[in-house]
Amino acid sequence: DLFMETMEQAEAPRIGAAIQANALMMFGTPEQQQQYLPAILRGEAMHGMGYSEPQAGSDLAALRTSAVRDGDHWLINGQKIWTTTWWGKYMFLAARTDKDAKPPHAGISMFIVPMDAPGITIRPSATMYDGTFANIFYDNVRIPAENLVGEVNDGWKVLTGALAFERGLVGGGIVLKVAHAFEQLRAHVMAGEGDQSLAGEPIVRDRMAT
């Protein structure tokens, strides 16, 4: 849309937590929407995505992080890897609430986990692209029962809905980013004059055409 196009042309950093906001608008309770969406809109609360695990990368249905109901709370135990927004205020976390469910994805639920909750250990790791991700360990992390997003054991619908929205968001952003980069390249090629112009080079013209 126009907003994303303008952001990419300005080379502005991406802000907010659009993926989690969309999931809350689709599956969250009115109370959750009132509590979390305004802070996301203001850019005051980033939400990470706690999906992948050591034994559950591309096969998210194999995740083992557990959530067990304990009165008015859920107890979270497990490990998440490759988490990029580990420094966010909240984690949008997938956990298993029925270890015997068949098929396995039928026993997954989604939660909002405050990242300042006791029992969370964060171990950041540097990457080759000068960014960081983190291994995050959850050890008897207690969260309120109302932090469940969607229905118990129906988190696969929430999770896949969030992933589908992310594909559209990221894919559209990449197309706009490439288009902007091409326009910058074209301007650079056309900027010179005479012998200094790259536009007259056959190889450059061929590469630009393809």
Regions from the language model: what does each represent?
Residues 1-46, 83-90:
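Internal helix-loop-helix
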Residues 29, 111, 138:
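Residue-level signal for inorganic ion chemistry
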Residues 36, 63, 79-81, 122-125:
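Short beta-alpha junctions and helix-cap segments that line functional grooves
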Residues 55-58, 82-85, 100-102, 125-132:
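Short Gly/Pro-enriched turn/cap motifs at secondary-structure boundaries
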Residues 67-68:
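A structural signal for short hydrophobic beta-strand segments in well-ordered beta-sheet cores
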Residues 79-122:
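A short core secondary-structure module
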Residues 119-210:
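Glycine-rich beta->alpha junctions and the first turn(s) of the following alpha-helix
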